[in-house]
Every structure is written in structure tokens, then in C-alpha cells.
């Protein structure tokens, strides 16, 4: 296949055009007075959202070179979302600002490699200052404030704070779609462990790439399954019951996994396989925890049990299981409550007796999984479109809150990024390296500028006035007031702000140092096919 090439300014200009098209779409959503974007779906109602990464992933540009620029920004948003769970719009705005300012200097003759060095130095100084300004999350009210800002909804903030209060900051919180219009919180007994599905073909929800099993059986073993014949009897028993099956095993090798996948895709049975959590003795203990929680038996040679002889009575059961590529969450296991309570007491005793900090930490993790439960936020709305939009907001708010618990929080509304400018300006370098530093200094103003413009104000006026304020004071676009941002509860997680800046700087530096771009040549439309019909001379 022939390729099309562009070099130097031509290449960078085309990619910048793509960056601008995507960023101009995404940045309209930033701030309390940001707008929504409507995304067409291949089927069903359109999606209305203000979630940066969702918008970025939906954009495909016709021009191959512009599309590459757009995809680089989408990667910034996606990476920020993966690390911090929020801040995708901020990352996009920062990327556009760094690329725009950087390319002006490259076009004027600056050395892109020098600019990249300056960008990296400035980013490191900004991140160090962000950590210095960061406040730790100590109270339920602070958690509620952070969640409320991210979701732009106080009620949601209170709900997330309540959920984290009930299951702990590291507890499992899932977000479900409700059949009603109210958004509610339920805490159910459950357990999560860090193993996901063995094959992506086992998913039941292709949009989220996750598998959901309702009222499934659970086969728990520390053995490797290499031959499908080993588990065929129990598979047949499960199929006869018309139920789904989760297999937790040391590994599934040979022809066993492809056979399970093939039968799943054909609809013969609904099965998901995951690897057993932990290693060595800890693995055995965790499998026993799962067995007690679900009312099953661990199929292990230690007990003289064989896979071929497994009966349906030895399988665990649960109300619901959610499996992603990284985690498995078991909700409402059918185990005996007395047995679970006894297991919890045993683990507590082991925690009291152990002298190893590492062992104590692992035991506390097991205790939290057995006793902590799972908080479920049931999202309600009047329409399907509103439901999706609200669910996106709550997911972002939960991610932002977890990030704040992890690394603390700073003044929100882009204020912290302007506050770090003084620390970055203190850097003194020569030539193009200093130009790179100045590029980041100007870009740090861009989120506040855009928040102000979305509120119908002149961005430059707000930025200049903000620079005159003492650290932590900023502009509240929701009320059109200048306030102490932290006292007013307008805060951003440090991790979100840091990740947005680091990812934006990283990809922008790569784009600025691009000298050639290679793309597929546009394909001519194929001629229309002749209509189907019989052979000449046939009736």
C-alpha cells in the first residue's frame, strides 16, 4: 500500500490542525459553565456528555495527517483518565496550549530539541510545587467537596462521601444503572480481587469491555486446567441448571481456554475464567476466603479433591459478579454468615499475632475484602440519554475523589496551575531551553483562561487578576466571585492536576520534535457493484 509523506513545517502544521479541531471540541466543556457535546451513536439515541476522554475517543478526522494530531491528544486524555480517572479536559487544553506556543517558536527557527528540554524542566518544577502546595484529605466533608466539584452536583458529592465512609477509602464502589429516576446508595456484601478475564471474548458488555454474570455458580480451584474433559461433568451440570459459571483457577492452558471461548461465543453456555489471586500460601488463603464467602469448596489435592469428580454442591454461588480486564468483584456471596464471621475473627487474630508489617498489610487487605462489602451507587434518570451522561459524571467524580485521597488536593478552577508559575519562572536557562520553559509558563494559564471564556468573560483579564491574588485565591466561575478556593470547597485532586500536566507536556514535546509524518494514501471509492442477478441467457 502506497504511503503519503509530509515533512517539517508541513507535517507539524497538519498535525496541529488536528490537535486544534479536537481540543476546540473538548475545551467547551471545562469549568462550571462548560457546555455539553452531543455524540452520534451507530445505533440508538445520541450520547450527551461533558467527559473529555469520551469526546476525544469519538473524534475521527477525514484528513489522515490531521487525524494523527487529534489521536495524539486523545492519547493524552486517555492516559490521564487511566492514571487519575479525571482531568482529561484540562490535559487537552494544556496540550493545545503547549503545542500552539511551541510551534510558533519552532517555525521562527528555534531548535525543537532545546524546547523539549525546557518543557521537561518546567514540568518537573511545576509538579514539585504542586506537591508542596497539596493538602491531605482528612474529613468526610472534604471528600464530599471534591466529588461535588467533579460531578458539578452536591448531592452526588454527598453520596460518594457516604459510600467511601461506609466501605473505607480503599473499599469497592461500583456504579450501576437504576430502573427509577432517583440516584441511591446501597452497601452490599462483596469482595474484589485483582484478576480479570483471561480472554476478552468472554465480555458481555462490549462498550465497557466487562463481563457481568447474574446468579452464577463459581468453580474454585488451585489447579491448572489443561483439558476440557476435566471440567466437562460440572459444565454439563451448570448448563442443565441454565446458569452462568465463573471459573477461578491457577491457569487455563492448552485447548481448554479456546474451547470455553468458542462455546461462550456460540451461546452454548455463559462462562468467564479468571486466574486465582495471590501467590503460594496467600493464594490458598484467598481461595478459601472466596469459598467461604460464596458457600463453595476449594478443589485442591490437599483435600483429596479432583476436578473430574466435582459436583454442583461444591460450587460457590453469588447474586452478581462483575469482571473487568483487571478486577473481579463478587457481590452477595451465598456463604453462611456464621462461617464468614468466624473467618473474619480468625484473620483479626492473625493480624494481632503477626510481627511482619508486610503480612499484617496483606491480612488487613483480606479482612477489608471479607468484612467491608461493596458500595453500589444506583444512578437514576428520566431518559436513557440523561442516564448515560449522569453515569459518566459520577464515574469521573469517584475517580477524582480516590485520586484526592491518594495524593491530596490543591486549589481548583485552574488556580493551582497559575500558582506554580512563580516556581517555574525561577528557572533560568539559555536559548531554546528557556523558550521551552516560557512555553509551559504560558500554557499553565490556559485552563483558567478557558474556564473564564466558557463563563462568557475575557480570559486574559481573569488570568492577570489571578496573578495578583495570594496563593490559593481564585475566580469562582459558578458565582462570579473571587474567593479562597480551598475554603470555598473548590478543589482539584493533586494527582489529576499533576497527571494532566505531565501527559500534556510529554505528548506535546513529541509532536514538536516530529520532522516527518507517514500516512496511508486516501483510497478512491470503489465503483458501485452491479446488481445481483442471474447469468446471461437464464430465465
From Swiss-Prot:
It is an enzyme of class 5 (isomerase). GO terms for molecular function: ATP binding; ATP-dependent protein folding chaperone; isomerase activity; unfolded protein binding. GO terms for cellular component: cytoplasm. Gene3D superfamilies: GroEL, GroEL-like equatorial domain, TCP-1-like chaperonin intermediate domain. Keywords: ATP-binding, Chaperone, Cytoplasm, Isomerase, Nucleotide-binding. ATP binds at residues 29-32, 86-90, 413, 476-478, 492. The keyword ATP-binding applies. InterPro entries: Chaperonin_Cpn60_CS, Cpn60/GroEL, Cpn60/GroEL/TCP-1, GroEL-like_apical_dom_sf, GROEL-like_equatorial_sf, TCP-1-like_intermed_sf. It holds the Pfam family Cpn60_TCP1. Belongs to the chaperonin (HSP60) family. Forms a cylinder of 14 subunits composed of two heptameric rings stacked back-to-back. Interacts with the co-chaperonin GroES. This is Chaperonin GroEL. The lineage of its organism: Bacteria, Bacillati, Bacillota, Bacilli, Lactobacillales.
Amino acid at each position: 500500500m502506497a504511503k503519503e509523506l509530509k515533512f517539517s513545517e508541513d507535517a507539524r502544521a497538519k498535525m496541529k490542525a488536528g490537535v486544534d479541531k479536537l481540543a476546540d471540541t473538548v475545551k467547551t466543556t471545562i469549568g462550571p459553565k462548560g457546555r455539553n457535546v452531543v455524540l452520534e451513536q451507530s445505533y440508538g439515541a445520541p450520547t450527551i456528555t461533558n467527559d473529555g476522554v469520551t469526546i476525544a475517543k469519538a473524534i475521527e478526522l477525514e484528513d489522515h495527517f490531521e487525524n494523527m494530531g487529534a489521536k495524539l491528544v486523545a492519547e493524552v486524555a486517555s492516559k490521564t483518565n487511566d492514571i487519575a480517572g479525571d482531568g482529561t479536559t484540562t490535559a487537552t487544553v494544556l496540550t493545545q496550549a503547549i503545542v500552539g506556543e511551541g510551534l510558533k517558536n519552532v517555525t521562527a527557527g528555534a531548535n525543537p530539541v532545546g524546547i523539549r528540554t525546557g518543557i521537561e524542566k518546567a514540568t518537573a518544577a511545576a509538579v514539585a510545587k504542586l506537591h508542596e502546595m497539596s493538602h491531605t484529605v482528612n474529613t468526610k466533608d472534604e471528600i464530599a467537596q471534591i466529588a461535588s466539584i467533579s460531578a458539578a452536583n452536591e448531592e452526588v458529592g454527598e453520596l460518594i462521601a457516604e459510600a467511601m465512609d461506609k466501605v473505607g477509602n480503599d473499599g469497592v464502589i461500583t456504579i450501576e444503572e437504576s430502573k427509577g429516576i432517583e440516584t441511591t446508595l446501597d452497601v452490599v456484601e462483596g469482595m474484589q480481587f485483582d484478576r480479570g478475564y483471561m480472554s476478552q471474548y468472554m465480555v458481555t458488555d462490549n462498550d465497557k469491555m466487562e463481563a457481568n454474570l447474574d446468579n452464577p455458580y463459581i468453580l474454585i480451584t488451585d489447579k491448572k486446567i489443561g483439558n476440557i474433559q476435566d471440567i466437562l461433568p460440572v459444565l454439563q451440570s451448570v448448563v442443565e441448571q441454565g446458569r452462568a459459571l465463573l471459573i477461578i483457577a491457577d491457569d487455563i492452558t492448552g485447548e481448554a481456554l479456546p474451547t470455553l471461548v468458542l462455546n461462550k461465543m456460540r451461546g452454548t453456555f455463559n462462562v468467564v475464567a479468571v486466574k486465582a489471586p495471590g501467590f503460594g500460601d496467600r493464594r490458598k488463603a484467598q481461595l478459601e476466603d472466596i469459598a467461604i464467602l460464596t458457600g463453595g469448596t476449594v478443589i485442591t489435592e490437599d483435600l483429596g479433591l479432583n476436578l473430574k469428580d466435582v459436583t454442583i454442591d461444591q460450587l460457590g454461588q453469588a447474586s452478581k459478579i462483575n469482571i473487568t480486564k483487571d478486577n473481579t468483584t463478587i457481590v452477595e456471596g451465598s456463604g453462611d454468615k456464621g462461617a464468614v464471621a468466624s473467618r473474619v475473627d480468625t484473620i483479626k487474630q492473625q493480624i494481632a499475632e503477626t510481627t511482619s508489617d508486610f503480612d499484617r498489610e496483606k491480612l488487613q487487605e483480606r479482612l477489608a475484602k471479607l468484612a467491608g462489602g461493596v458500595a453500589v451507587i444506583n444512578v437514576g434518570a428520566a431518559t436513557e440519554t440523561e442516564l448515560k451522561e449522569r453515569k459518566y459524571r459520577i464515574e469521573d467524580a469517584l475517580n477524582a475523589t480516590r485520586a484526592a485521597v491518594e495524593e491530596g488536593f490543591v486549589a481548583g478552577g485552574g488556580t493551582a496551575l497559575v500558582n506554580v508559575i512563580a516556581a517555574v519562572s525561577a528557572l533560568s536557562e539559555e536559548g531554546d531551553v528557556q523558550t521551552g520553559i516560557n512555553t509551559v509558563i504560558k500554557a499553565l494559564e490556559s485552563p483558567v483562561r478557558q474556564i473564564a471564556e466558557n463563563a462568557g468573560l475575557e480570559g486574559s483579564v481573569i488570568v492577570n487578576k489571578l496573578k495578583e491574588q495570594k496563593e490559593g485565591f481564585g475566580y469562582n466561575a459558578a458565582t462570579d466571585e473571587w474567593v479562597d478556593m480551598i475554603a470555598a470547597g473548590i478543589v482539584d485532586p493533586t494527582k489529576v492536576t499533576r497527571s494532566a500536566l505531565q501527559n500534556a507536556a510529554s505528548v506535546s514535546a513529541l509532536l514538536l520534535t516530529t520532522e516527518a509524518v507517514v500516512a496511508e494514501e486516501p483510497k478512491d471509492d470503489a465503483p458501485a457493484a452491479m446488481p445481483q442477478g442471474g447469468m446471461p441467457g437464464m430465465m
